[in-house]
Amino acid sequence: MTLLAKSLEELTDWVKDQGQPAYRGKQLHQWLYEKGVHSLADISVFPQEWRSKMADYPIGRSLIHYRSVAPDRTRKYLLKLADGLIIEAVGIPSEKRLTVCVSSQVGCPMACDFCATGKGGFTRNLKAHEIVDQVLTVQEDFQQRVSHVVFMGMGEPLLNIPEVVTAIHCLNKDVGIGQRCLTISTVGLPHKIKQLAEHNLQITFAVSLHASNQQVRAKLIPSADHYLLSNLIQDCQEYVQITGRRVTFEYILLAGVNDLPEHARELAKLVKGFQSHVNLIPYNPIQEVDYQRPDEKRIKAFKTILEQEKVAVTVRYSRGLATDAACGQLRSSVMVQ
């Protein structure tokens, strides 16, 4: 088995199976999650003979294939997995926190019209250790503890719930990040929101809405053809009832597509009446598509309408624009080179 993303109990059972005393499990746990070891051969508290014997045993760490740094100190990583596939992770520093944006899949099958990742197709789900590794890699590179993790990188997390939930538990219990500092973002899939809710996680849950009516959403998100907006909102209301946690709606503003005053009023009607918050995200243009970012006047007007309708709303801007750091962009640009 791969050791990363395993609990203290699982690691203790493993060392005992290898003929080692149980206390080695606690040592292994510490070296994996606190010291960030990449090889069992580097665990100095282990007997030299066993270290040499187990030197090639898979821990589950990946290699940094490419790294770029933006003027705002955002760092974008391409990580090479054990099978040679490439995924993205982003480290986003601010004054009092370090946030990591992680991928949950290699590529993405959702094929959203405005997304660079979707243009590259889908290969496979990530394993839990490949998700946790992204966080540890960024933490080591910054030499600073990660405070927040957002599942907003490559892939649709709700198509990989077992591995994502395992990673969530590991990041919480083993890496030491509070569940409320962990965010899962989804475009929404039938039955999957309730399935996630039943895990009773105290995470932040975000839905990539991006449209205020069915017609526009189906154009932007092909899967919306099979999942009506009205049903998505009902599932979000049920999520709030089950978990007691609010839903955050992510809304990318696309000039002339979903940023008109009538869209703002439609959006307000959708999200009022239950615990929710709207994040407005001005679009980060990519070469593959023709969508554009609205001007600041249009962004402010959209936000003002929501505020007048008593909707909790925040405008959030993408970090790392100078280094293709919005989701999917760096991988697509580097793979073309």
UniProtKB/Swiss-Prot annotation:
Its EC number is 2.1.1.192. InterPro entries: Aldolase_TIM, Methyltransferase_A, RlmN_N, RNA_MTrfase_RlmN, rRNA_lsu_MTrfase_RlmN/Cfr, rSAM. Gene3D superfamilies: 1.10.150.530, Aldolase class I (3.20.20.70). GO terms for cellular component: cytoplasm. Disulfide bonds join C101-C327. Keywords: 4Fe-4S, Cytoplasm, Disulfide bond, Iron, Iron-sulfur, Metal-binding, Methyltransferase, rRNA processing, S-adenosyl-L-methionine, Transferase, tRNA processing. It is found in: Cytoplasm. S-adenosyl-L-methionine binds at G155, E156, S185, S208, L209, H210, N284. The active site is at E88 (proton acceptor), C327 (s-methylcysteine intermediate). Belongs to the radical SAM superfamily. RlmN family. HAMAP family: RNA_methyltr_RlmN. This is Probable dual-specificity RNA methyltransferase RlmN. It comes from Microcystis aeruginosa (strain NIES-843 / IAM M-2473).
